[in-house]
A protein has these predicted regions:
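Functionally important transmembrane alpha-helices
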Residues: 26, 163, 187-241
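Membrane-helix boundary elements
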Residues: 159, 166-188
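Hydrophobic/aromatic residues in alpha-helical transmembrane segments
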Residues: 101, 148, 202-206
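Specific transmembrane helices
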Residues: 2-137, 165, 232-241
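Short juxtamembrane and helix-loop transition motifs at transmembrane-helix boundaries
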Residues: 123-129, 178-188, 209-211, 215
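Residue-level hotspots within the lipid-embedded alpha helices of multi-pass solute transporters
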Residues: 125, 133-138, 170, 195-200
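Membrane-interface helix/loop boundary segments of multi-pass membrane proteins
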Residues: 139-166, 207, 211-216
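Alpha-helical transmembrane segments and their helix-entry boundary regions
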Residues: 10-14, 88, 147, 161-162, ...
């Protein structure tokens, strides 16, 4: 098994990432009906975190260790913060601006009761940014952009590598379509195809930023967090107008 993983780094990573996450996600699908309403969201959040830790994060640790003999490359990518300033501008400003602009222009659900009122209009989005950061991007990006992207780019050109990674990333989310507590569109096949279009587009943008930042996983994490933050924060703020 170890020999096979070493000789098939990309496939090995994908198998480990999917298995590690799905082993938590898939059983939760039938079990969710047995969970009391008041415990449903905390249970779903807990299972989601376990899946993130056991999926792309653990897979990247295992594969980095097996393919390089150490975790030095894994940890050094976190510390790579001295990168071109344009990388930060794209990750922290351009992405949220683009998503919020698109959300304002494109048709969506009718606005409901505002989630943020008073001082919370400022404080709420800041807190959300921190919560989202530790709730997914860190665990995911050490795997997707930290391990899988460089391996793919050794074989194919960056743009094609990003598209392939977007499909892999989208497929990894599939069990989430069957759990209402997880923020994944669940209405029809069009929603699924739209989600894959979103993950492919997101993968292209985040891979571009990561490459601009000389492979910095830190910038990939910030870019991923900006996507999550902008999507949710806009839905909270649009109710005010």
């Amino acid at each position: 098994m170890i020999r096979w993983l070493r000789s098939h780094p990309l496939t090995g990573f994908v198998v480990l990432a999917y298995t590690g996450s799905w082993i938590f996600w898939v059983p939760f699908i039938p079990l969710q009906k047995l969970i009391p309403a008041e415990s449903y969201k905390p249970a779903a959040a807990g299972v989601g975190q376990l899946a993130l830790l056991a999926g792309p994060l653990l897979a990247s640790l295992i594969m980095t260790r097996l393919t390089t003999g150490s975790l030095r490359a894994w940890t050094s990518s976190f510390k790579r913060w001295r990168v071109p300033p344009v990388s930060y501008a794209l990750a922290l400003i351009a992405i949220p601006a683009a998503i919020m602009t698109a959300s304002a222009v494109l048709p969506g659900k009718e606005a409901g009761t505002p989630s943020f009122v008073g001082p919370a209009v400022v404080i709420g989005p800041l807190i959300q940014g921190v919560v989202f950061l530790i709730g997914g991007p860190i665990q995911e990006e050490v795997g997707w952009r930290g391990f899988a992207l460089p391996v793919l780019q050794e074989r194919i050109r960056p743009l094609r590598a990003a598209v392939v990674l977007g499909v892999i990333w989208g497929g990894w989310h599939l069990p989430q379509f069957f759990v209402s507590a997880w923020d994944t569109p669940q209405n029809n096949v069009t929603d699924v195809l739209g989600f894959f279009a979103f993950t492919i587009t997101g993968a292209v943008v985040m891979s571009w930023i990561t490459n601009l930042a000389h492979g910095s996983v830190l910038l990939a994490i910030l870019a991923h967090n900006s996507i999550n933050w902008a999507l949710v924060t806009w839905s909270c703020l649009r109710c005010l107008y």
